From Swiss-Prot:
It comes from Chlorobium limicola (strain DSM 245 / NBRC 103803 / 6330). PANTHER family: GTPASE DER (PTHR43834:SF6). The keyword GTP-binding applies. CDD domains: EngA1, EngA2. One of its GO terms (molecular function) is GTP binding. GTPase that plays an essential role in the late steps of ribosome biogenesis. HAMAP family: GTPase_Der. The keyword Repeat applies. Residues 354-437 form the KH-like domain. GTP 2 binds at residues 184-191, 231-235, 296-299. Associates with the 50S ribosomal subunit. Belongs to the TRAFAC class TrmE-Era-EngA-EngB-Septin-like GTPase superfamily. EngA (Der) GTPase family. This is GTPase Der.
Length: 437
């Protein structure tokens, strides 16, 4: 296992900026608004040939609102999980009550944990002098640094990695995990869904929309298959996106879909399918990802034996050409159909990478052409000679014909429907390409 380093501190001291500086990428959301990183976020890093995991946490503060209490609990969990801790403060705002509370907590409760005390935003000689007063926290060897320009960070990393055990190297060149992006509008139950699967309070969960702003990876194994769940902030309507945090969160949703094999799109059963849900689904379809639609909070719906059929028919009437997407009714609260959802997602992943022999495809083509003959266009007849599958990350089929311009949309839809039925391609977009031969 790679050693785990946790970044802790009160809100807005620059933890996410330091996180990005160490990893040399814009992974955690960075904003001047206090408390922007509200959950734990773990990413792999490397320094001087040594590998580690870096965890960015929500800010620890003494406020008594529900979100602050959850952030405190998450920070404590992060400290317990970590091999060592970077305790970050801000020289520009000076030592605060929350800084001193964190200092006491670390020295009393976690005295056996390696703590690296850092003072951030030390970017001038005067600020260096000001930073000297931070020894009153009880940490006698503070690191003066600037996460923004990188000064002092290398020295701290040298000492941290020197103190940690070597990571165990494993051969993970061939990643066989199934990557699932858990996406949807705010407050549809994405984090509750992930927590129910993992059996742990891994994410902050409350009824306040947007309590998960960053995308966070969690791994678990089911039936000897490893899964990576990428939980994201909900994608909001543009009118609700603030300049700053919500923009980055929406971008994170898009990036999560880019990384995944299957986009698991959650709906709130009470709200039904909205334009924003279709936007997320279309985003996944355009990127040629598998898609699974989960109608969450089904336990809150009054129903009889026909309710799910009526509900699904209504959904599909609004989905247009996306009828190939499987729909499941779940409850993250009662765990109804949770594992069925994972099994279906795994099946979709297999469908997406399915390879079909050319001989099987041409037998299919022969049967399809005998059932429906392509209509003529401008007096010209479409003649398809053969077909094959093109090597790609999703199913792409090439049809070699006399003139691609003669292919009409209804015939294209017919072939796509029959391909799905014949070769088990539910849940994945497929591409048909007609080429002149």
């Amino acid at each position: 296992m790679k050693p785990l380093i946790a970044l802790v501190g009160r809100p807005n001291v620059g933890k996410s900026t330091l996180f990005n500086r160490i990893l040399r990428q814009k992974s955690a959301i960075v904003d001047s608004t206090p408390g922007v990183t509200r959950d734990r976020h773990i990413m792999p890093g490397e320094w001087q040939g040594k590998q580690f995991l870096l965890m960015d946490t929500g800010g620890y503060c003494a406020a008594n609102d529900v979100i602050s209490s959850s952030m405190i609990e998450q920070t404590l969990t992060a400290i317990r999980d970590a091999d060592c801790v970077i305790f970050l403060t801000d020289v520009r705002s000076g030592l605060t009550y929350d800084d001193l509370e964190i200092s006491k907590l670390l020295q009393r409760t976690f005295q056996n944990k390696q703590i690296f005390f850092a003072v951030n935003k030390v970017e001038s000689p005067q600020l260096t002098i000001d930073a000297e007063s931070f020894v009153s926290t009880g940490f006698t060897r503070p690191y003066f640094l600037s996460a923004k320009d990188g000064s002092g960070v290398a020295d701290m990393l040298d000492d941290i990695l020197e103190s940690l055990p070597e990571s165990e190297h494993t051969d993970d060149d061939e990643d066989t995990s199934v990557k699932l992006a858990v996406v949807g509008r705010p407050n549809v139950g994405k984090s509750s869904f992930v927590n129910a699967l993992l059996g742990t309070n891994r994410h902050i969960v409350s009824d306040i929309p947007g309590t998960t702003r960053d995308a966070i990876d969690s791994r678990f194994i089911r039936k000897q298959q490893e899964y990576v769940l990428i939980d994201t902030a909900g994608l909001r309507k543009r009118t609700k996106i603030d300049a700053g945090v919500e923009f980055y969160s929406s971008l994170r949703t898009e990036k999560a879909i880019e990384r995944c094999q299957v986009a698991v799109v959650l709906l709130d059963a009470r709200a039904g399918l909205e334009k924003q849900d279709l936007k997320i689904i279309n985003m996944a379809e355009e990127r040629k990802k598998g898609v699974l639609l989960l109608v969450n909070k089904w336990d809150l719906i009054e129903k009889d034996s026909k309710t799910s059929k009526i509900y699904e028919d209504d959904l599909r009437s609004h989905m247009g050409n996306l009828s190939w997407i499987p729909v499941l009714f779940i409850s993250a609260l009662t765990k109804k159909n949770l594992y069925r959802a994972i099994d279906t997602a795994e099946e979709i992943s297999r469908n997406r990478s399915r390879k079909i022999s050319t001989s099987s495809l041409n037998r299919f083509l022969e049967e399809a052409l005998s059932a429906v003959h392509p209509s003529t266009k401008s007096g010209k007849e479409l003649k398809i000679k053969y077909m094959t599958q093109i090597d790609s990350h999703w199913p792409v089929f090439a049809f070699f014909c006399n003139n691609p311009e003669l292919v009409q949309s209804n015939f294209r839809k017919f072939l796509e429907k029959k391909l799905r039925e014949q070769f088990q391609l539910d849940g994945v977009p497929i591409s048909l390409r007609f080429m002149e031969k």
